[in-house]
Amino acid sequence: MNIGLFVPCFIDQLHPPAAIATLRLLEHYGHSVAYPESQVCCGQPVINAGQSDIAEYAARFETSFEQYDAIVCPSASCVATIRHLYPQLTSRCAAVVEKTYELCEFLVDKLAVASVPGRCGDRIAVHQSCHGLRELRLG
């Protein structure tokens, strides 16, 4: 499968290793993963700051990702913005919105991954995000 990796702006700026780990994980399962350099923020920070017009973000998302079989993002907040707000802005985004997934959702629901190989000597805590639980109905 040809996957477009949508990297949230906060990961891009504050924790790039998370984006690299996401790419490697998807490649581990045998998929071709690309990072379209034309991608921009989903627009959620702009909305949170009070601006409601994010049509430009939706249009840019559509042109950046239309050629991929799936779009995977390691952020439920960004995916919720894309799924719930973009269709209200333009009907052109429908095709890309339908193939946009939060990372864990993609692994479990699309790839049927039951466990991830590897070991970690530390304890790991999992945070079920509010947007993942409430807006995407994950978990």
Residue ranges of predicted features:
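Iron-sulfur cluster-binding electron-transfer modules in prokaryotic oxidoreductases
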Residues: 1-139
